[in-house]
Amino acid sequence: MLSSFCGDGHPFSTGLPNVSICAQHTVLVWVPAAFFLLTLPFLSAQCHLTAQRFARLPFSAHFIIKLLLVAFLAANSLATWCYVLFSKNSYAAAYYVYPGLWVLVWTGTFLVHLIRLRCGLVSSGIQHVTSLIFLLCGAPEFYQWIRMENSNSFPNDLTTTDSAQFLSIAYLSWYSALILYTFSLCFADPRGAKTDDEKASSKSAASPELQSSFLNRLTLWWFNSIPWTGARRDLEIDDIFELNERSGTEFLSELWESFWEPKRLKYIHDTSIWAKKDPSEQEKDPVVIPSVVSSLFMMFRWEFLLASTLKFVSDTMQFASPFLLHELLNFISAKNAPFWKGMALSILMFSVSELRSLILNGYFYIMFRMGTKIQTSLTAAVYKKTLLISNSARRDRTVGEIVNLMAIDVERFQMITPQIQQFWSCPYQITFALVYLFITLGYSALPGVVIMVIFVPMNIISSMIVRKWQIEQMKLKDERTKMVNEVLNGIKVVKLYAWEVPMEAYIDEIRTKELALIKKSAMVRNILDSFNTASPFLVALFSFGTFVLSNPSHLLTPQIAFVSLALFNQLRSPMTMIALLINQAVQAVVSNKRLKEFLVAEELDEKCVDRSVNIERSHNAVRVENLTASWDPEEAAGEKTLQDVDLTAPRNSLIAVVGKVGSGKSSLLQALLGEMGKLRGRIGVNGRVAYVPQQPWIQNMTLRDNITFGRPFDRKRYDQVLYACALKADIKILPAGDQTEIGEKGINLSGGQKARVSLARAVYQNLDVYLLDDPLSAVDAHVGRHIFEKVIGPNGLLREKTRILVTHGLTYTKMADEILVMLEGKIEESGTFEHLIKRRGLFFDFMEEYKSGSDNSSEAGGSQDDDFEAIGGEIQDYMNPEDVVLTVTNDLDETIRTPELTTQISTMSSPEKPPTGTSPAAATESQNKLIKKEGIAQGKVEIATYQLYVKAAGYLLSIAFIGFFIVYMTLQILRSFWLSAWSDEYDPDSPSAHPMAKGWRLGVYGALGFSETACFFVALLALVFVGQRASKNLHGPLIHNLMRSPMSFYDTTPLGRILNRCAKDIETIDMMLPMNFRYLVMCVLQVAFTLIVIIISTPLFAVVILPLALIYLIFLRYYVPTSRQLKRLESVHRSPIYSHFGETIQGAASIRAFGKVDEFRQDSGRILDTFIRCRYSSLVSNRWLAVRLEFVGNCIIFFAALFAVLSKEFGWITSPGVIGVSVSYALNITEVLNFAVRQVSEIEANIVSVERVNEYTNTPNEAPWRIEGREPAPGWPSRGVVKFDGYSTRYREGLDLVLHDISADVAAGEKIGIVGRTGAGKSSFALALFRMIEAAGGRIVIDDVEVSQIGLHDLRSNITIIPQDPVLFSGTLRFNLDPFFTYSDDQIWRALELAHLKHFAAGLPDGLLYKISEAGENLSVGQRQLVALARALLRHTRVLVLDEATAAVDVATDALIQETIREEFKECTVFTIAHRLNTIMDYDRIMVLDKGSILEFDTPDALMADKNSAFAKMVADAAEQDKHE
């Protein structure tokens, strides 16, 4: 039938390398036509999706040319069809059908182009592939017509020469036009030109990806400009292409919410119904939390399906290589095989490999792009949820857990995405390979398959064991990082107490355990890797052994040996991958669980606070009725933070809220913000709300931006706010004025300055209702009075606003319109100041305590109630450890202006401080930042960095590692050539045919394989010791040097940057670098030995090595610097994501209160998009390289096969076995070439961690801890006589003096009060005593010992300080009191008793072994301060410094501390730095400092007697503040 249709008796026969005319006119026409028709729906969908995003394309010359070519192809097909239809000659049926199909296809193509123009689709892969298929299928007929024209012989079914000539000219012109058309599709149709506004909207270039043609995208040609730029200079962020709209945070966030939000709302609805059911029914019908994975699949289902299709095609095509290898070996073995067949096989091997490479790279490109989109979607979702989550849900999660959701769990989703298709791909590859093996070896393949199957559970079990150890190791790493974090947080206290040694020992102890687990995991992995690497050999050994021994007729020919070996090698990858997939899947399931639980967690109830404008609109701004609220409504039955609260705040009124610590004052403000769970009652707030938290929230931006907070800049309003908040003097000393970037959490501002910036932000917003949580507690008397008068009070800027002020400063309450007195979550009393005084109730008692409690100065200490503090404090301390860097320096002297601040600014910017009053515009950009941004490393990594790592690892171990790998590769090649000789011994024509006993062949093959495996294992064993030694020798000195670094280092270096060295960089050194070096050495050796094998097999191959190597090096020249810089950009732009996230968590309440949630989400989106731009470009650069290097690898395959064919054709003696070895090695080189370059790039990126760690290992150190021969006598100081003799000091060489010519003699046991206005030098005085800053002149002598002549530890361990902000560490209560374990339990209990903590400690479950949480968050502020007092009592040195140690506690606790100090330290010399003047009025002498000099130094009585003395004026200021009547 087909013969009749074609008019040919032999429809598919061919004697030459031709395709029959029948096939040309049937199959080769039907296939492309069918492809075109079947893909039309997909093309239609592509046009529809594109039309939603882009405008219509303009008519361009390029488009018109394509349209004309398609029109010609259609017209030519129509002419051919008409000629055949209306010709007088008779033709076979096929001649009538195929032109008609052409007309249909090309007419359809013409219409598709017009539709594509309208839809804005610049290029279509479907059209390009269709034209390529037409081109390939038409090639045989094109060749046929040319051959017939040359020979002037035509087929029998063409009856006349004229008809033959017409059809010949028609087809040749048609095919020529098809070539031109296919070439034109290599270029995309241009879009319309951008407008000037669009060009100016971004500094970075728009990505050309979406404007590129299909071939351009397939080869990633559009990315060329990035490597081109990267090879010429270091890349900058502006060089990186912008993300496409659908890869950006804004689009993906909306897409995520469209799929996730309905599921979340349904879950909440179902949960509310479920909660009402009986417990028995609840167990039977639990509510299932919606899966994150299902939502992600729905978002990216079409991309996923496209990638699946590509993966399926790629996996199928990989089995073409063994088939073609089999045919090539058959060709080599056959004596009379035609030369063209060998050439065709060579071309086919190259074409199939190159096509598979392009398809596989397309698959990875899609999946990696999907991974970045998933990362963007989930990161944005976690960020948004953080701003909406309720406090009760938030309390169940530490900050670390929330950060890990973004840093680890989201990252896992991104990393597993490219591998997710392997779950179906691996079984498919295994099945296909097994079928092929059974065809090749029969049942002899079974032993090999059984071995590979055994490896699967072995891999799984080993992975589970390693995973268990990895979890333990991660816990130890977290514990070590947390401890380093805490030590660096409290580094000033650590140094003041001389605790560096026990802290370093504690960290080293954790590190030793961590390294032990890393070693155990590595050993198991190495055993597993050795088995996996040996698996092809073991499988081949048993399979070949079974094959040749089971039947004497079974001959191990090259075709069987090397095709089977190729299949075994292809089996190894999916078999090994299964265990990794299971491991990754388990991690992904855990991450999915953690993410979905967080994303469905309870959110703040927006309806909790009624913000309707109609609430008491005529008069009241705030109305609270019968409010009962709790931080955890689900556990409200046990504890209610607020109970039965009624509150009315008229418009423009000032309401003062007072009460003891923990009475619920801060909780009341939180309830008004909607932050607490409302159990019953009603809250109404009329107007926009501003919130000033007790712990100031400062962003990492300029001072001005912190104050304007997104509002337009209004100079007049701004200046008013600066003056009212007493910030003008501060701005004058900043290097760039208010344009100075003040660092994370305002690291270089004092507590008082941060409080005033926080207040200024709220005032500048000009809102309606102000909730002020004790904003005056951090400032001293005259500043507090100024702020109250100019901002809060009846005549302040907020006089026309409603103000609810929480305060411990009872002197401010007189001017309040109403006072609320809180006790245990209830409003006990309310009324005006006069009314409450007359009632002589709770408020009157407070006033009495206030008057008699030694604090009538500028502020009364206060803190949040414990419930709120548990949340706020955790965020503050965990996320931004830098906050405590200047605790002593700043909090000793916190207000308008401090020389210490000026000095630190100078330290961080330039040696020359700008003159006071310098215009911000005149300041250089470098002066704007107090903390400099971390620089991006540029250029190549120095060879010295590699030498440093090798030196740390040990030279002998490094040489052993490389040496055993060389032996391993040598044995592998010997084994391959032994197999070659074995397979050739049955070929009588082979020059290497030397028959041997099968047992001997098998034995030697096995011996070589086992020796090879042993060498591989020993090499890996050496690598384990290399990594362990390097890790130990790099981490230990780093920690030691950090302990030895002076405070100036910590003043100018954000702790986050230091922590990055101790955490991320050390992890890279531990885990990544050993693996990088392993794979690099393996790849380099494998490439080198492969080339050697091919040259030995076919010496002619040496001719092409040089050009191929040149091409390879050119690609390296462009890729390596580009990849290196992209990795660095990615690393640098990753940090802002977490910094901004940390700021957001810390300031979530403020962000919600000010209504800035959407703005912060947009800011987070911009930061995230910048990072994703870098990561996406880095991933694309890998694919860009892979496309090009795999082309080089495929060229090696082609030349290896080609020279084998030429060797046979020209009589160069080459056996099939040797050719089998050569081509087998060549088939494996493609991925190795790419992987080798990737490893070079990875090592360059990761070795930077060694450089960064070494940088902080060699920073300048402070003075020695101990000086041999200069140790003070035991018991020193025994008297406590302190002498300052002309003492001067500065913070660093070259900076201004902060203390000038201080001379003072302090007798033993004397009590000295140190006071002064802000900037007087009080904090510098305390730091100088402990040598935290060194003398620039003069000396300090304690008991006849000059302190500069002894070691720092000898000094600091023998004098004591009680800081204002007590620092506690994770560990037991005992460890926090006595880390050296110097004192007995009885002594510690005695100290706790004297510190009024014994009753508390005795009631703890574990007593002295009670676990203190991070930063001591499970103790109240007052309890932490008492622990600091207990430390001082334990040490009981003769010299004691009190750094305003009672500022953060209430009056009662203050009285306890003062009483204990007076009693227990009555024989000691005491220096008290005080803002509260009443605490020092009974001291022996008062030292008044001013501008770094002693202004006055006399007894309190003498100074008070002189009414013109500075001290007398300070007391008068405080007294003025205390007037109540």
Swiss-Prot record:
Keywords: ATP-binding, Cell membrane, Glycoprotein, Membrane, Nucleotide-binding, Repeat, Transmembrane, Transmembrane helix, Transport. It is a multi-pass membrane protein. Its main location: membrane. Disruption phenotype: RNAi-mediated knockdown results in increased death in response to the environmental toxicant methylmercury. Furthermore, in response to methylmercury, RNAi-mediated knockdown results in the accumulation of the methylmercury in cells, the subsequent increase of gst-1, hsp-4, hsp-6, and hsp-16.1 gene expression, and in dopamine (DA) motor neuron degeneration. GO terms for biological process: response to methylmercury; transmembrane transport. Residues 900-925 are annotated as: Disordered. Glycans are attached at residues 18, 1228, 1358, 1418. Residues 46-66, 116-118, 187-346, 456-535, 583-953, 1027-1068, 1112-1184 are cytoplasmic. It comes from the Eukaryota. The chain crosses the membrane at residues 25-45, 67-87, 95-115, 119-139, 166-186, 347-367, 435-455, 536-556, 562-582, 954-974, 1006-1026, 1069-1089, 1091-1111, 1185-1205. CDD domains: ABC_6TM_MRP1_2_3_6_D1_like, ABC_6TM_MRP1_2_3_6_D2_like, ABCC_MRP_domain1, ABCC_MRP_domain2. InterPro entries: AAA+_ATPase, ABC1_TM_dom, ABC1_TM_sf, ABC_transporter-like_ATP-bd, ABC_transporter-like_CS, ABC_transporter_C-like, MRP, P-loop_NTPase. Residues 1-24, 88-94, 140-165, 368-434, 557-561, 975-1005, 1090, 1206-1525 are extracellular. Belongs to the ABC transporter superfamily. ABCC family. Conjugate transporter (TC 3.A.1.208) subfamily. This is Multidrug resistance protein mrp-7. The gene is mrp-7.
